[in-house]
Amino acid sequence: MSRWLWPWSNCVKERVCRYLLQHYLGHFFQEHLSLDQLSLDLYKGSVALRDIHLETWSVNEFLRSMESPLELVEGFVSSIEVAVPWAALLTDHCTVCVSGLQLTLQPRQGSGPGAADSQSWASCMTTSLQLAQECLREGLPEPSEPPQPLEGLEMFAQTIETVLRRIKVTFLNTVVRVEHSLGDEDRSVAVEVRVQRLEYCDEAVRDPSQAPPVDVHQPPAFLHKLLQLSGVCLYFEELPSQADPPQPPLQIGSCTGYVELMVRLKQNEAFPGPKLEVSGQLGSLHLLLTPRQLQQLQRLLSAVNLADPAGLADKLNKSRPLGAEDLWLIEQDLNQQLQAGAVAESLSLYPITNPLNLDSTDLFFSMAGLTSSVTSAVSELSVYSVDLGSSVHSNMAFHRPSTPPHSGGKMAPTPLLDTTRPDSLVKMTLGGVSLTLLQTASPSSGPSDLPTHFFAEFDAAKDGPFGSRDFSHLRPRFQRACPCSHVRLTGTAVQLSWELRTGSHSRRTSSTEVHFGQLEVLECLWPRAATEPEYTEILSFPSHSGSEASARPCAHLRHTQTIRRVLKSRSRRSTACHCHSELSLDLADFQSDVELGSLDRLAALFRQVTTPSEPPAGLLTEPPQATELQTVFRLSAPRATLRLRFPIPDLRPDRDPWAGQAVRAEQLRLELSEPQFRSELNSGPGPPAPTRLELTCSDLQGIYEDGEKPPVPCLRVSKALNPRSTEAKYFLPQVVVTLNPQSSGTQWETAYEKGRDLELSTESPCELQQPEPSPFSSKRTMYETEEMVIPGDPEEMRTFQSRTLALSRCTLDVIMPSAHIFLPSKEVYESIYNRINNDLLMWEPADLLPTSSAAARPPGSSGFKMCKSAFKLDSDSDEEDAQFFSMASGVPQTPAPEPSRRQSQSTFSTLVTVLKGRITALCEAKDETGKRLDVTHGELVLDVEQGTIFSVAQYRGQPGLGYFCLEAEKAKLYHRAAIEDYLLPTHLEVPSFAPPAQLAPTIYPSEEGVTERGTLGRKGQGPPMLSAAVRIHLDPHKNVKEFLVTVRLHKATLRHYMAPPEQSWHSQLLDFLDVLDDPVLGYLPPTVITVLHTHLFSCAVDYRPLYLPVRVLVTAETFTLSSNIVMDTSTFLLRFILDDSALYLSDKCEVESLDLRRDYVCVLDIDLLELVIKTWKGSTEGRLSQPLFELRCSNNVVHVHSCADSCALLVNLLQYLTSSGDLHPPPRPPSPTEIAGQKLSESPASLPSCLPVETALINQRDLTDALLDTERRGLQELAQSSGGPLPQASPVSVYLFPGERSGAQAPLPPPGASSHTLGSKAKEHENEEEGDGDTLDSDEFCILDAPGLGIAPRDGEPIVTQLHPGPIIVHDGHFSQPLGSTDLLRAPAHFPVPSSRVVLREVSFIWHLYGGRDFGLHPTYRARVGLTGPRVSPSRSSGPNRPQNSWRTQGGIGRQHQVLMEIQLSKVSFQHEVYPEESAIAGGLGQELDERPLSRQVLIVQELEIRDRLATSKINKFLHLHTSERLPRRTHSNMLTIKALHVAPTSSVGGPECCLRVSMMPLRLNVDQDALFFLKDFFTSLAASINPMVPGDTSEAPRETHSRPGSPQEGQSEDTETASNPPEAPGSSHSSSDQQPIYFREFRFTSEVPICLDYHGKHVTVDQVGTFMGLLIGLAQLNCSELKLKRLCCRHGLLGVDKVLCYALNEWLQDIRKNQLPGLLGGVGPMHSVVQLFQGFRDLLWLPIEQYRKDGRLIRGLQRGAASFGSSTASAALELSNRLVQAIQATAETVYDILSPASPVSRSLQDKRSSRKLRRGQQPADLREGMAKAYDAVREGILDTAQTICDVASRGHEQKGLTGAVGGVIRQLPPTVVKPIIVATEATSNVLGGMRNQILPDAHKDHALKWRLEEAQD
């Protein structure tokens, strides 16, 4: 090298400099440089060029050769200075200084670049040897002969190479500007990159020692270039139109610090590594953008497409031959098609999802398609995933690999080696990055020149803004730099890596990786007129801040994009290429604030940033070839903390959306373990695919934070083991959001719908369409005229949910494998309820970007469908017609005028699935007074299995319509009223779902033995245990929201626990759920109307008393509850329908689980029962217009099946329930010593005060007479002193009740029973009942007096008494005509409106009384109990058992079904009314009533029957209504009527007084001796088994409101009562003031009741009733004995119901003994017929005389006498004759039985006799039927005799031959002689009976009612 250091000549220097400039830069200049144009300073070695304009075409050709996406528009260079150190050329470097370089570029139009050759970057650098040769030859004259090689040419080339390596280029004040026109708009945008200084040199300049040796023949494999930049700034300019003045560009970014880039170029392909590698370092990068700027930048970058897929496909598709790998793939695909069956079968079991949507048919031109070859797509994936790295040369040969052996019948394809090679690699390290994105385009707050102020703030920092490990110190600086609302991304220690790989198969892959040492994403909101901003941490990493920051990056972003070609020749696609992108984000433990206002602002920001897609020019324009894009996004982190902030909803129209964060102090912190988020976005030709966002985690914890209060763990969701998987896989918590798109109305869709309409128009109009899916059952269930709404079955629910999810714009699917919700108090629940229900759900997004409708609607959005016919609006072709909220445009598209509701899209659907869940609620524990208990709380736990919650809003595009569904396969409720407080858990554990130890099961699935009906079908096919469906409809015009709620509970059991009202599970649950709604600004709550339908199927109530040895089970096959609930209304209606229910009792209390049919006894069976409850809040005036509470009940029949012990147990249970037995433990039974001592200390005063009835009545009357005068004198003195009227005396004041002192002043007696008092009116109101015994109430007629009625004279002549002289004047309309039928239960009109009313209408009861016992330990003993013994007739004791109609009537094993009686009360009506207090009715009644009514009861029994079903009795009806011609049955008559009126006493002391009135219809008694004794024994055993009412602890038992006279009243204090009572002995019983008997001030039996009695004695019984009574009972026979129950009226007062019964029985018995013995004895034996016989003769003679004396009509008297003689005498004679004939018949039958031989009778003959006996028991209805029966009897008798003789002869002949036959006939002769007598008497009896029944039809009817048919008995 040293020999080249001679002095350079000027010629050489000029040639070298000119050549260098011309060679490198000449073709870029507009003028060509020559030696004359150079101005050289040869001594200093410098050259300068100024004001150079670049040649645009040459530069663009150079850029096009490099496949650059940009082209030059204009270029200018201020100056170019080149300095060459000639003196030290080989040791010093040459410098090129370019000042004022300005380049204006724009995106290049035309096909984009393909895989650029990286050598083009160095194509301008030719070899130094060529350069030396051209340099020396240029300018010399052409030689005449070939030139000779220059000596030292290689040495000169080596020198040039050395000089070129040491060139240093410096760019000063460089401006690179990229402009882009925005489509059809006038405006354009420009981005400028301003670089103050850029130095470019070779790596040898910095470190000459690392430079490789110079070799002119072998260039180096890699070139290393160094770029150093400083003062880099980014500017953005929006070029205005020509009319607008230009604006200076705005700075949007700056690079602070030192920027250094190392460029590594590979010149030899044999070496591994990328062709171009750039690595650099950057201090910090700050960006400040507005949404519009970011949008324009996106459009600019999209225009500058670095990898245009169309160009790539065009370039790579040109003349590409089939290579070895293509032929191999073809062969593989052919092999797979041959095995398509096996592959398809395997893939059907394990489907393979193709995340890249790669289609192997796109690889070749020659293949039609590999549609069924999924494996080929998988093989292609494997091919594309192979990375050869840097060890494979580009010219390697491909060989087909060897085929592996077959395994399992299938061949796995061998992956093909990939040919992708690294092309470019960029690695950057940034000290810090900050991106500040303003939320508004023109912020109102902040300085006017915000960019200048912003970047000046950061340029002032000398040490850089990212000096600390956290970002807390940056917030004040950003507050000063940008005082306006923005979103900021800040990151430090950023490492950026980008790699581009290209290869065969027209595929290019680019991958980008970004690592953040620290990262923070903030929203900084500046409210108006605020000095401090409000921060929302969108993404932060608290664990990576501070001194303990980890070296591991907090965020790792990976982005991989693969582009491959798609053939254009395929007609089914219009895509030019397929682009698949994967974006993966790995985060460290992070936290994020989730606030709806911030999300709304971010969404608005996103809508501003995103570029709307350009619509096609027209409908018939062919769409351009689109790119099929598929983007997969994944996010994962070890832990995540989401802080959900609850917004403050503001629905006012004039609210300020930028007023700041309107959030509550409460927040919900969600801690997720191992969260993973995945989303996939697809775009391209064809219908748009739905977007799916999926979030999974292994564990989720929710902590509710309320300000300064301690945090409350309220939610825990964890994974659960999958029981169906053998690999122990888990179900993970999952949240999936699916965004379904809306297809636009294109020409193809319009054509399809047109054809669809033509197809549908030809359908038959009679064809039924498929019903629309609904959550309600399609099976119509009607009750009366109302349709019962029932939730749908599981299939209907699934159909509705799947269809709704498919037709929803947005769906949310949440899966919770194991969930636990914990609510520690009602306050926390109320807070959470208001935060979620009133804040989250009521929040609405603000109008952040107000735009006009014309600008918001994209062109072409209103498709051609607006002209579509409405003929078939419900067809399936309108599925995509619904309006849809576009994520790209952010503007809801305008819907069609009348969209099809059937195919319109719903707005939002939610499906929450809980495999196992538990809700724990801690509620308040209160005592009986409602006061909260300290240190205790109640607890409720609800467990759910396989539960689903489904909700849809704006169903099918209807704004006010929504549905809500709830299902649970199993549900269990546990409860405990009071538990001691314990420490609340700091975090929730995963529940084990075992029953809580301290809680009792309350509602749970019914056990197998409890349900009556088994599960139909296989297991799991039945309906779920709990299902609910709610329909929500809001009418915005009326502001009315209607809820249709249906609930179904299937096979559930309620365990009933008796508790105080405030401690029951339902009261605590309702109190816990009764929360107040916080008001919402700008929201007017609508009027809510709720229609509730609750259905319980196959449910039960299990009750186990604590102190009663019985277990109770109530089952109901169907229980329906319907209600209409309207807010702010005074009326509430509730209806219950109970169908097929029963009550069971069991005495097996020690067994936990029982079987219904084996261990229980059904005692109550209800067929259908309806209850209607109506409540009224009352009026504001305080007056009642209707009852505050009204209960109405009606049913068809109630069956009671009981023996004496089960009935007594039922009565004891009712007493136990009414007295709240579980709450009051029974007293300890006294020991025998205490009992003996108590008996010795008893005094006469302590003896029972229950005296005989006669003695009590005598004492009563004596006391009344003795004290009457004294009382009158005292009242007269009192009235004279007070000046008031003199009241009449009442005998009620003579009693001294317990609790009154003997020396106390007698209380004031009530006013007498004057004609205007309420009591008198109540009595006289029903005087009409005394006349005929019929209860006919009238609300308008009130008979006050009937003057003139006196004692009739003895001759019976009526005497007319003249009351008013003169004519009688009739006033028309004086009495109002009643409207409709009269309500017998209604109170008179002058009564006040009751405050409560209970009504039972037409309820029927049937009481089945069985013999034996249902419970007990000795079944053999129970079988002997009953009528077995001397009472049973030997001839009837062997009767068969009665058949069982149902298993419910089986009862216990000791029940005797052959011993049965039935008591039936048909159409029972009852009404109980309670009247308000005196203050409530005083204003309404005034002085009309002197007595205040308290309550009124009415009981009406339309029909009362007692049926005899004993096997030993022939009686049919034991008791029934007696009707005859003299007493016909009235149409609306009631058999029994009882009316009771309770009034308040006029005195201050005493309880309510009752006026009782009873009326009854005539009775007919058919008494069998066995039935009578059974009833006696039954009720005796029943009375003995009923436990007496034992009062509990008076300190715990609540006092009754009403008590008998003498008890303290409500307003009287307990101290007064205690002072008035003497102290009792410790062993004495409690005072009976708590349970006072009713005091009856008046008792009236208003009607005289005739009774017709028949009695049939069977056997003498002397062991119980004595000898005489036993003989009398056993031998007595009564027929039509007549009795009468006389009218009763007792006004002396009776205390207790027992006294009333004793009084009535005593009066009737005395009357019967004194006056009715003749009528009773007239029925003994045949006396009734004899009496009738003589009565007929008497009437025949006496009636004409009586009629003549009365009115002189003798003929009328003769007619009456003849009619009476005919009906009485003739019927009596026939009856007597029939009795005589029957007696002869009985005697003949006895003789026949004696004379008949003992030979057996054939079976056929026995059957014939039994059938004749059945027909014989039925009396003929008339003479014709009697003659027919007589003929049949004679004919059958003759045939029977002949058949008997033939049978005897044949049997004797078989046994002994002819002798035996003759002997048998001779033995049969005596009974044969007697047989005609029997037949004749039977025929005669039939004829006489027919004649009697024809004369007297009532006799036949009475016979049919009295005697039981033999068929019914058997």
Swiss-Prot record:
Task: Give compartment(s).
Answer: Preautophagosomal structure membrane; Lipid droplet; Endoplasmic reticulum membrane
Amino acid composition bias (Low complexity), ranges on this chain: 1429-1446
Looking up Pfam families in the UniProt record yields: ATG2_CAD (PF13329)
- In this chain the Chorein N-terminal domain maps to 14-112
Q: Which stretches are tagged as biased composition: Acidic residues?
A: 1327-1337
UniProt region (WIPI-interacting), positions on chain:
1337-1383
Protein's membrane topology = Peripheral membrane protein
What's the main place this protein lives?
membrane
Name one molecular function that GO assigns to this entry.
Answer: lipid transfer activity
**Signal sequence bounds:** none
List keywords of the entry alphabetically.
Autophagy, Endoplasmic reticulum, Lipid droplet, Lipid transport, Membrane, Phosphoprotein, Transport
Q: Which GO terms describe its biological process?
A: autophagosome assembly; positive regulation of autophagosome assembly
**A cellular component term, taken from the record's GO annotations:** phagophore assembly site membrane
Quick check: keyword GTP-binding in the entry?
no
Q: Does the keyword Membrane apply?
A: yes
Which function does this protein serve? Lipid transfer protein involved in autophagosome assembly. Tethers the edge of the isolation membrane (IM) to the endoplasmic reticulum (ER) and mediates direct lipid transfer from ER to IM for IM expansion. Binds to the ER exit site (ERES), which is the membrane source for autophagosome formation, and extracts phospholipids from the membrane source and transfers them to ATG9 (ATG9A or ATG9B) to the IM for membrane expansion. Lipid transfer activity is enhanced by WIPI1 and WDR45/WIPI4, which promote ATG2A-association with phosphatidylinositol 3-monophosphate (PI3P)-containing membranes. (Microbial infection) Mediates the intracellular lifestyle of Cryptococcus neoformans by supporting infection.
- Return the domain comment text from this UniProt entry: The chorein N-terminal domain mediates lipid transfer activity.
Q: What is this protein called?
A: Autophagy-related protein 2 homolog A
Q: Which organism is it from?
A: Mus musculus (Mouse)
Q: Which gene encodes it?
A: Atg2a
